[in-house]
Design a protein with these regions (language model features):
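Conserved Nudix-box catalytic region and its N-terminal flanking loop in Nudix hydrolases
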Residues: 34-75
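NUDIX/MutT-family hydrolases
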Residues: 106-108, 116-150
Length: 192
């Protein structure tokens, strides 16, 4: 069947909009063969209070997804990762409130083993855990899928990993993090 221009216009209004307005970052550290993934817990009186999650956040107007990832990691954890990867598959979910399919670019970020975590007021605890423990703690299936992708695409060491390292792209685009959220001193935070 051959499509005519007016046929396409008749179909398009029925298509559910797709948008990328959020990012997800799986921050990890390694020492030798030991590897730990950072999870942060949503603070009380916040939406999803008590839920363990990777770093997540919104993409601001005019901001790229990777720049949003850098900014959110800095704002929510105080960390400045040394290496970054864009995972092959974004997370995706349907938002019934807005009748949109949301696409969430997923990144992996490596930090130094000794880097201190300073949480924003959005979270009340953090924990560095094994990949298996992280998969048990997170709420969403898409986050468990991303943990498997992190293992297979970034950490396996195989040259055929589908994740693309984007560390050099950050320097080229000057995706410099800026801190805008107030922080409480790290001494008040408890590790889980």
């Amino acid at each position: 069947m051959r499509w005519r221009r007016h046929d396409l216009h008749a179909i398009l209004p029925r298509v559910i909009p797709v948008s990328a307005t959020q990012i997800e970052v799986h921050v990890f550290r390694r020492r030798g063969k030991r590897l730990e993934l950072l999870l942060i817990r949503r603070a009380p009186r916040r939406s999803l209070a008590g839920v363990w999650q990777p770093v997540t956040g919104g993409i601001e107007r005019g901001e790229t997804a990777i720049a949003a990832a850098v900014r959110e990691v800095r704002e929510e954890t105080g960390l400045a990762p040394i290496r970054w990867w864009a995972l092959e598959r974004p997370a995706m979910f349907y938002d019934p409130g807005r009748d949109h399919v949301r696409i969430v670019p997923v990144f992996a970020a490596e930090v130094a083993w000794t880097d201190p975590v300073t949480l924003s007021d959005e979270h009340d605890r953090y924990a560095f855990v094994t990949l298996a423990e992280a998969a048990k703690r997170v709420l969403w299936a898409t986050q468990r899928t991303a943990i498997v992708a992190l293992r297979d695409e970034v950490l396996s060491g195989s040259p055929g990993g589908a994740a693309r390292e984007v560390t050099s792209r950050l320097a080229a685009t000057r995706a410099v993090p800026r801190t805008t959220k107030p922080r409480r001193p790290a001494a008040r935070r408890r590790r889980a």
